[in-house]
Amino acid sequence: MRKYIPLVLFIFSWPVLCADIHGRVVRVLDGDTIEVMDSRKAVRIRLVNIDAPEKKQDYGRWSTDMMKSLVAGKTVTVTYFQRDRYGRILGQVYAPDGMNVNQFMVRAGAAWVYEQYNTDPVLPVLQNEARQQKRGLWSDADPVPPWIWRHRK
């Protein structure tokens, strides 16, 4: 019985562990990083579970432009649980209409599933659809994932 106590405490503390930010997107840095105004302070958000092409990489600017068209200047909701080693909030971003932006970017072929860290079971399904439909970066015969591209540089 004692071995279940930490699990029960974790489950009941879950709502406390996650938080939301509601704010206007003041900057789109790339296809997976935005800045949101939260209480008069810009907060950097890294979209969790996805990895978009780097700006200098093939499809990088296109991915950034896609993100801009979705959220730039708009009020979004960010649900998050933690920060990364750079201090960015790792968050799930929702557009004003409730659309899951992280999932949209993968579905459009504007980002990869960050498989090493992914916790969203829907994303691999969306990525397979995008690949089969040759959407976005999947129109390339052999797209290079950003984590490999960064390693080569």
Curated annotation (Swiss-Prot):
This is Uncharacterized endonuclease. The active site is at residues 46, 54, 88. Transmembrane segments: none annotated. Keywords: Endonuclease, Hydrolase, Nuclease, Plasmid, Signal. InterPro entries: SNase_OB-fold_sf, Staphylococal_nuclease_OB-fold, Thermonucl_AS. Belongs to the thermonuclease family. Residues 1-19 form the signal peptide. GO terms for molecular function: endonuclease activity; nucleic acid binding. CDD domains: SNc (cd00175). SMART domains: SNc. The lineage of its organism: Bacteria, Pseudomonadati, Pseudomonadota, Gammaproteobacteria, Enterobacterales. Pfam families: SNase.
